[in-house]
Structures are given as C-alpha cells and as structure tokens.
C-alpha cells in the first residue's frame, strides 16, 4: 500500500516510508513561504495501482492560482507519473552501475539508448555517485517529496531503501512532446558539456526520457539530489551600502559571475544549441552542424561527443505548437554558421511573423478559439518583419569602433536562467551548483542579455548626493524612490564590474550604445504578453533617433535607418504604448499574467478582496473611493 497525506494548497509534498513491505507513504503538507501548517489528510493506495484516483492530489498543481482560467491552467500542470515505472528505472541504472564498475578508470562512455525508450548517462551511473546494491537486492522508492512547483517543471525528491536520494524533474505538458523532446535532449547534453568540458558543477544526470512512452509515462529527467540552500537566501538587492550582510551580497555577485565566466570561456563553432552526437542516429543529420563543436579537443572520449543543432531558446518555441514543425518552424531554428551571427535576430523575427500569420489564418477559418484581436496580430507581423529587416544592419560586424568585436561575435554558451534562484550551495562542501539549463543556447556575447536578477533599464543614479540636487531636502517618499533607483543601478554596476574583472575582452557588450543596438532583439526574446510587441517597436523607434550618430561612428551597416515610420505610425504607437502602461498599472497582477502565489490568493479570497465569478474566474475587488 502507498499512504498519501494530502493538504490543500501545499508548497511541499512528502511521501514517507511505510513499515509494510512494498509500500510507500505519500504526504502533502501545507507549508508555504509565509505560513506553515501541520494539517494533513492521509490516503492509502496500492504501490502497483498507478490508476488509483486517490493519488491524483499528489500530482496536482498547488503553488498558485490564476484569476482567469484557473481550472484549465492547473490541469495543464498536472504531472501524474508511474511510481512503479520509476522503481524499474532505478533498478535498471543500478544494474548499469555494476557494469560500469568494470570500465577503466577515467573512461567517459557515450550515452546509452535503452530498450525502454530512456537514455542513461552511464559515465554518471557509477557507484561513487549512486552507491552500491547487493546482488539479490532491489531498489525500492520509500519517500517521494514534491519540493518545487516551478514555472516549467515539477520537482520531486525520491528517497530509496538504499538511503540514496534522487531528483525527478517532470516538465509540465504546456507544449507538445516534440517541443519537450528537443528541450530535454539539449538540456541534458548541455549540462553534460558544462560538467565535462567547462568544469561547472551541475547535478549529475543519470537517466532521462523525452516522451511518455517510457516506464515513467512522462518526459522526465532523473538526476543527483544536492542537499543545501539556494544562493537566493543570501541575495538582498536593496541592501544598504556597508551593511553587515555586505559579504553575502558580494558573494552572490561573485558566484553567479563565476558561472557566467565559465559558460563563455570556450568559443564554439556555430550558433544553436548543444545535443549529444549520437542523437544523430535517430534524427536528421541536416539538423546538426557537421564540424566539431569546438576546436582543439585532445581527449578521445570527448571528441565528437556533442554537436550543435537547432536552438531551443524559449522564445523560438513558445506558443507555437499549432505550427507545422518541419515547414514553418525548423527553417528558423538554426543551427547558424558562426559567420552569420545576425541571422539569429533575423530568424527570430521571421518565425514570430509566421506565427502571427498562422494564428490569423486559423481565426479566419474558425479553427481557433483564442480570444485575440486581429489588429494585435497584424501589428505583431509588422513589428517582427521590421525586426527581421533591420537585423543585418543592427551591428557593423567589421567595425573597429567597438573593441574586440570578433570576440563579442563568437559563439558562446548562453544560460537564460543565470540567477541565485537557480544555484544551490551544497551543505557539506559549501560548493555552488548550477541547477537547470533549460533553454540554453549558443549565441554571440554581444546579443546576450544581462541576468534578470540584476537587470535594470531605469534612470541611472550612481551617487545620491552628487546626482540628485538637494537630496537631503526631499520628502521621505521621494528619497525612497531615488534610493531604489540608486540600488538597482549599483547592482547592475557591480555585476558589470565583475564581468570586467573576469572577461575584460567582453566588457564592451554592456556599453550603452551596444545595449541600445541589441534592445529590439532583447525585447523580442523577453516578451511575455501579446501586447509587448510594443516594447520592440519602442526600441526600434529609439534607435531611429540616434541612428545617424551610430552610422557616423561606424557602429551600424547602413547610413540611413532601414525602416520607414510615418507620423501616423508613431502617433499610434505612442497611444498604444500608453494604453499598455495604463493596463499594467490598473490591472492587478498583470506582471504575472494573473497568477497569484497560493498563500496570498487564499488570504485575498478569505478577506473578500478577490471574488469568484459564476464562470469560475476571479475578479479583484476595487477599493471604494474615499469621499
């Protein structure tokens, strides 16, 4: 029997050991960031009964709720998997571990494609990583803990009767299996590359599956459990200068910057994403760059271990499951030769324009139920076609005005989630591990945006007393506003200072003119909502104002700005952008697309601040105007 204990709106779910033979106990404890509750409900179920509906509560999404389409959004994040199938996979990797014990010391073997449609990284499946098992002993899952319900994955901790813990990552089925397949294959290979070639500490991956045909019945990654604390625990972006926590602040900047330095340390031979070379046997060879991923490898075990293939950067795949993959997506995903870095921007624009055109066609044919104004989609087409058009001229790749331009244009590994929330410091050795690499790709450093935890595009204030006239005479509210701007400026400056210390040849990538030149592309990469195409337009119009100066300084390819905007175009843009800003200010939780952390949601619902409607949606009750 499996014993489940379930409580509503949990942040932590635990499956504990039962004394009964062949049984595990599943416990879901309500424990949020703000509130901790010991209330729980226990449910019993058989270990071998994967279809028992009593288990479902353990797999449901519980970390937040949505104001709109809450039921549908939670159903998209339902991560039911086969515990019995997980048991079988664990036993398989221990069998492989015994076989690997016979391999010569230091030998790095290629991944093994198993008959059960999983892949094992046998160089990681060794006794020093997973422990040993007696010849007649079987591995048994004793505890399952749901330790994180993230934006894209559910993370489970798996304890066994061998006193060995693992992490099981299950991606939410927000996209089709083809998308998840590319993403998982690339992420696993990239982490392998980071570990074996770049010397970056990452959790060891033991086994993975890219579709639901494997014993787990879900795409999954089974990897090493790292016990420790997230680096985010030490990060305070609004710390006062000279605070007692200054060392912690400095250490966070250093740790994240050191990871970035290792990521970009090796120049690669193409733009795209990293895959295992033996993925070729089941795929199309034209997907992959034929030449070596990098030059000068002398270790025969690493030669031809990896290849560059289609980019899995999230913006290229987001909300595109309705496109014909081979005809409408694949031509724009790369890989791209290192002589054509600006093709990344061009193809990003062309793919998004194709996506908007298809959505319009589907809507006109009556085959789409999405609530989207045709005008917005038509404006998106214009915006993204403009981005594609300007791409070849954004940077003069032969300019001498930007120092070390060729270094900035070389393919280097880019990690989109370089953040203290994605770094754990292990308990024993106090070593930092970079946790997941989803969406990692290779692109020129000049097109790589700053990590989100230090990114700041607002007014720069480097010294409150010098930059702000009569600062001491301001009201407390005004001082707080300027102090916020100063601290955000300081954080970004400290990051860029560390970049200069670690990689001085790359520092010009953060020069203001370079930031402005890449800003339309960055806005496209970071777009979260339908209306944010306006931020791309805004960046393009800002470039229009300074293009002549950039041309005079040999920064861009064309003397004349490549795009045409009429007076009416600009006026309409200003009006639409103003409406977007007003919407963001007036619409509660617009920044999170209506998602609210569950503890906050419960509190607001119980207080009457959120009201449930007849259709299942929620509205935020506006405060009554004071008379």
UniProtKB/Swiss-Prot annotation:
Primary residence: mitochondrion
Alphabetical keyword list = Mitochondrion, Transit peptide
This protein's record includes keyword Endoplasmic reticulum = no
Q: Where in the cell is it found?
A: Mitochondrion
The record's comment on protein family reads:
Belongs to the AIM9 family.
What protein name is recorded for this chain? Altered inheritance of mitochondria protein 9, mitochondrial
- The organism's place on the tree of life at top rank: Eukaryota
Transit peptide feature range:
1-43
How is this protein annotated for GO cellular component? Answer: mitochondrion
């Amino acid at each position: 029997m499996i014993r489940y204990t379930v409580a509503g709106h949990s942040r932590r779910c635990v499956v504990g050991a039962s004394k009964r033979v062949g049984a595990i106990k599943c416990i879901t404890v309500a424990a949020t960031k703000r509130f901790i509750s010991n209330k729980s409900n226990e449910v019993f179920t058989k270990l071998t009964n994967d279809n028992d509906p009593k288990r479902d509560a353990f797999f449901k999404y519980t970390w937040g709720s949505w104001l709109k389409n809450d039921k549908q959004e939670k159903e998209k994040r339902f991560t039911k998997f086969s515990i019995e199938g997980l048991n079988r996979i664990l036993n398989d990797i221990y069998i492989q571990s015994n076989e690997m014990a016979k391999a010569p010391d230091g030998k790095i073997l290629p991944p093994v494609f198993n008959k059960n449609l999983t892949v094992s990284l046998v160089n990681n499946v060794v006794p020093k990583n997973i422990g040993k098992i007696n010849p007649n002993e079987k591995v048994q899952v004793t505890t399952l803990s749901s330790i994180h319900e993230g934006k894209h994955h559910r993370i489970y901790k798996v304890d066994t009767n061998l006193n060995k813990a693992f992490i099981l990552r299950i991606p939410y089925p927000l996209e089709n299996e083809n998308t998840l397949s590319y993403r998982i294959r690339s992420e696993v290979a990239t982490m392998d590359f980071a570990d074996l070639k770049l010397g970056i500490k990452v959790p060891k991956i033991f086994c993975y599956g890219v579709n639901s045909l494997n014993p787990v019945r879900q795409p999954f990654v089974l990897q090493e459990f790292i016990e420790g604390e997230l680096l985010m625990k030490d990060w305070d972006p609004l710390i006062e200068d000279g605070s007692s926590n200054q060392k912690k602040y400095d250490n966070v900047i250093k740790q994240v910057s050191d990871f970035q330095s290792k990521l970009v340390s090796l120049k690669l031979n193409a733009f795209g994403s990293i895959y295992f070379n033996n993925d070729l046997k089941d795929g199309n060879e034209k997907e992959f760059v034929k030449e070596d991923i990098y030059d000068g490898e002398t270790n025969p075990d690493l030669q031809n271990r990896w290849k560059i293939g289609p980019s899995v950067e999230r913006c290229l795949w987001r909300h595109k499951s309705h496109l014909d993959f081979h005809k409408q997506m694949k031509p724009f995903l790369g890989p791209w030769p290192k002589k054509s870095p600006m093709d990344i921007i061009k193809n990003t624009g062309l793919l998004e324009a194709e996506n908007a055109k298809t959505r319009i066609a589907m809507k006109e044919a009556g085959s789409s139920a999405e609530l989207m104004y045709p005008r917005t989609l038509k404006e998106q087409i214009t915006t993204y076609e403009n981005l594609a058009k300007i791409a070849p001229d954004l940077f003069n790749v032969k300019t001498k005005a930007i120092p070390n331009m060729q270094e900035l244009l070389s393919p280097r590994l880019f990690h989109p989630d370089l953040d203290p929330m994605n770094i754990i410091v292990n308990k024993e050795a106090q070593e930092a591990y970079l946790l997941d690499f989803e969406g990692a790709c290779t692109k020129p450093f000049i097109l790589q945006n700053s990590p989100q935890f230090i990114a700041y595009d607002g007014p720069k204030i480097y010294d409150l007393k010098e930059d702000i006239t009569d600062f001491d005479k301001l009201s407390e509210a005004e001082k707080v506003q300027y102090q916020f701007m100063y601290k955000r400026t300081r954080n970004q400056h400290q990051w860029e200072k560390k970049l200069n210390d670690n990689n001085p040849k790359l520092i010009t990538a953060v020069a203001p003119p370079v930031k402005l030149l890449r800003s339309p592309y960055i806005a496209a990469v970071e777009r979260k909502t339908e209306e944010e195409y306006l931020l791309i337009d805004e960046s393009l119009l800002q470039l229009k104002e300074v293009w002549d100066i950039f041309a005079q300084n040999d920064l861009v390819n064309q003397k004349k700005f490549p795009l045409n905007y009429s007076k009416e175009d600009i006026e309409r843009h200003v009006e639409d952008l103003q409406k977007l800003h007003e919407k963001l200010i007036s619409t509660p939780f617009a920044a999170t697309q209506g998602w609210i952390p569950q503890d906050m949601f419960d509190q607001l619902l119980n207080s009457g601040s959120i009201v449930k409607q007849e259709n299942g949606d929620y509205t935020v009750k506006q405060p009554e105007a004071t008379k």
